[in-house]
Amino acid sequence: MNSIKFPVLDRTTKNSVISTTLNDLSNWSRLSSLWPFLYGTSCCFIEFASLIGSRFDFDRYGLVPRSSPRQADLILTAGTVTMKMAPSLVRLYEQMPEPKYVIAMGACTITGGMFSTDSYSTVRGVDKLIPVDVYLPGCPPKPEAVIDAITKLRKKIAREIYTDRIRPQQGNRCFTTNHKFFVVRSTHTGNSDQQLLYPPPSTSEISTETFFKYKSPVSSHELVN
């Protein structure tokens, strides 16, 4: 897993001097020391916990689990995300330093799973809240699949240009620390009828009344940023 090759790093002179760029050196240092923040809400998280044991021993891949998002550069979401938990998840993501990455683990995290059918309180895909780098399907995915997802993420980091990643996030922000929840009419068809709106971060705010008080009864909620 540590044998990811860099074309620029492989070029050496006769005096064994490595010729590289600052961007490639930064990518090389980050891909071998990912610090994940674990956000597990359901059974998929138990499969990730298996990696901690001696059979898989994910420490040999440079993974150091952190309990604070401010010390992590990778968040791994596993399990169902509800409307009530959505602001907390986005707030945790915003607290992570750049550059940061997301792995969506399991069917419930990627699409809402079986809990999203005729459910008014389930987010149908965590990518409606935060940008996802690697999708890991399964119900639940095996520990070997988690290692494969981390390997693919490492390869992505190896080819990454930092400025190209930051610029789209700053220009097209689809997530903010503050959120708005609106109550709208919805049909229970099993399809994803949740939509995303992208207001400026300065105009978004969390209102307590939005969470607990509603002017008229409705059948479901819809999440918008």
From Swiss-Prot:
Needed cofactors: [4Fe-4S] cluster
GO cellular component: chloroplast thylakoid membrane; respiratory chain complex I
Annotated catalysed reactions: a plastoquinone + NADH + (n+1) H(+)(in) = a plastoquinol + NAD(+) + n H(+)(out); a plastoquinone + NADPH + (n+1) H(+)(in) = a plastoquinol + NADP(+) + n H(+)(out)
E.C. number: 7.1.1.-
Cofactor binding, note field: Binds 1 [4Fe-4S] cluster.
Cellular localization per UniProt: Plastid, Chloroplast thylakoid membrane
GO molecular function, one term: quinone binding
Membrane topology, from the record: Peripheral membrane protein
Keyword Coiled coil in annotation: no
SUPFAM superfamilies, per the entry: HydA/Nqo6-like
Protein's job: NDH shuttles electrons from NAD(P)H:plastoquinone, via FMN and iron-sulfur (Fe-S) centers, to quinones in the photosynthetic chain and possibly in a chloroplast respiratory chain. The immediate electron acceptor for the enzyme in this species is believed to be plastoquinone. Couples the redox reaction to proton translocation, and thus conserves the redox energy in a proton gradient.
Protein name in the entry: NAD(P)H-quinone oxidoreductase subunit K, chloroplastic
Annotated organism of origin: Draba nemorosa (Woodland whitlowgrass)
Lineage, broadest ranks: Eukaryota, Viridiplantae, Streptophyta, Embryophyta, Tracheophyta
Underlying gene: ndhK
